[in-house]
Amino acid sequence: MKLPAYIDMPFQEWKTSFSFFNKVSVRFSETDMFGHMNNVTPFIYFEEVRISYFKKLNMMSENKQTMTVVASQQCDYLRQVMPYEELRIYVKTSAVGSSSLTLHYLGENLEGEPCFTGAVVMVQVSKESGKAVSWTDEEKETLLHTR
């Protein structure tokens, strides 16, 4: 299997570097006319697991003056996923810049077979101005040590 550019190590090593995940069941409404999972569905799963991950890290609060926004994202599809399949959607921090963050994703079935992978670059911005805001040292430490 040809690896996407964002996976910079052997796939099995990359796969075992994840620990945080959500379980999902593919709903019939998430399929297309060909009977398999629609190509936009992984992005919904990525968003859901990302929110759970940020909550676990205590990085989401309505009182916080900043928020993270998606700058770019991609998904690479490895196998068909059918309605009602059970999946684990993993997320981990790959890199942290001054105000940016790269997350990696892995969607696999319960047999451990990878179904899709993904990456997203997010930027922390001020809720008021919309301008980029640097991560604090504490935030960087939290993000980098919770893979």
Curated annotation (Swiss-Prot):
Pfam families from the xrefs? 4HBT_2
GO MF annotation list: fatty acyl-CoA hydrolase activity
Q: List the SUPFAM superfamilies.
A: Thioesterase/thiol ester dehydrase-isomerase
Going by the entry's taxonomy, the superkingdom of the source organism is recorded as Bacteria
Annotated PANTHER family: 4-HYDROXYBENZOYL-COA THIOESTERASE FAMILY MEMBER (PTHR31793), LONG-CHAIN ACYL-COA THIOESTERASE FADM (PTHR31793:SF24)
How is this protein named in the record?
Uncharacterized protein YsmA
Species this protein is from: Bacillus subtilis (strain 168)
Q: Which gene encodes it?
A: ysmA
